[in-house]
């Protein structure tokens, strides 16, 4: 942890300061300095850079922004992050400021399936500067200045290899988190594959083939490394031919960029699964069908990527062997040592990338298990809702048939009329009955009065709206027929 700037310490020593205390840790606290805007993310231009050790893409490049409003109160805003910002267990809407108070709980990202809590959880506190200073995390500009000047620029004298370090080894060396924050562009690698045109949903049993391809590629690449090291004796080149391994490296990089972009899409699918879980009661079967279709599409795409990756590794090994034999036959030509160092470095970087992929397999498996589990829960909830709906409709039908039918026409009441004896009939039906007898068809009492029941009509109309289209159509036909007879 870096020490705070002495000038800032002098200015803040005499007063209290707001801070985000990381739960469960006595370090990496984030100071909220008055009058400044604090940005948090995994990018390079933020105030505090957070690199997740569990899931590199959990924190977005510019995840959230904290600043003071005109009244001087601190607010937090979700800067359209992928995995969200949570204030007191409630997810914040993007690009909207929310006031925070002392004791509030702030969570960045979501917990993985195997964990109960997220990796980055904080509590809003206000303490004296002296007690906060030892626990504060260094700002990103302090960390960058500490590492400034440690980078060296490599130079190559061979014209055929001038572009290889910039396009090959440096990109291959990037860890998964850095590649995800700045994706490799295939057009810059002179590759013919279009990785960005594929819409990836999620990973499924394709991880088995990923493991097999890594086991096959790793030993081959490592076995070629000692052979190249044996040729590293200092010789001078008089002429240089274009490296035959350059094309293979470029093709390999294109495939690796696709694999890394696949992980980015996996993080998006994890959030989609969480959203589906929250919207289960409002969801429809279309979401489930779409998710299953994406699973199948991604599985086929992943198998194709695995096959291409294995082919690239085999071609790369073959090319390296050819380069080794070529170097053995070269006499004292200028730049031979640079070429061999380049080949060794490329192999080492390839091996490091394979190790990174091997470490990230567990994250892929956790995400797949979480998605499958959420999909099953969504199906179960949908079945329960459908069963409840059918039960309500069945109960409604029984109620209509038993209580709300006219005894004369055996249909649901149309313009219900209640007699003095409390029995109800259709207005049309009782009028026709009274042409023959002026007594109740049920109890045989004389009809002295009749009252229209508007409440009963409205109740029947609303209940019929939830029934089948055949019942609604039949009722509409009866209403039209009776109105026509009444007018005639």
From Swiss-Prot:
GO terms for molecular function: chromatin binding; histone binding; protein homodimerization activity; ubiquitin binding; ubiquitin protein ligase activity; ubiquitin protein ligase binding; ubiquitin-protein transferase activity; zinc ion binding. It catalyses: S-ubiquitinyl-[E2 ubiquitin-conjugating enzyme]-L-cysteine + [acceptor protein]-L-lysine = [E2 ubiquitin-conjugating enzyme]-L-cysteine + N(6)-ubiquitinyl-[acceptor protein]-L-lysine. A zinc finger (RING-type) spans 406-444. Residues 145-156 have a biased composition (Basic residues). The modification Phosphoserine is found at residue 157. Residues 68-72 are annotated as: Required for interaction with PIWIL1. It holds the Pfam family zf-C3HC4. Residues 38-92 form the FHA domain. Residues 141-164 are annotated as: Disordered. It is found in: Nucleus; Cytoplasm; Midbody; Chromosome, Telomere. InterPro entries: FHA_dom (IPR000253), RNF8 (IPR017335), SMAD_FHA_dom_sf (IPR008984), Znf_C3HC4_RING-type (IPR018957), Znf_RING (IPR001841), Znf_RING/FYVE/PHD (IPR013083), Znf_RING_CS (IPR017907). Homodimer. Forms a E2-E3 ubiquitin ligase complex composed of the RNF8 homodimer and a E2 heterodimer of UBE2N and UBE2V2. Interacts with class III E2s, including UBE2E1, UBE2E2, and UBE2E3 and with UBE2N. Interacts with RXRA. Interacts (via FHA domain) with ATM-phosphorylated MDC1. Interacts (via FHA domain) with 'Thr-4829' phosphorylated HERC2 (via C-terminus). Interacts with PIWIL1; leading to sequester RNF8 in the cytoplasm. Interacts with WRAP53/TCAB1. (Microbial infection) May interact with the L.monocytogenes protein actA; however, given these errors in the sequence (AJ242721), the relevance of the interaction with actA remains to be confirmed. HAMAP family: RNF8. This is E3 ubiquitin-protein ligase RNF8. The lineage of its organism: Eukaryota, Metazoa, Chordata, Craniata, Vertebrata.
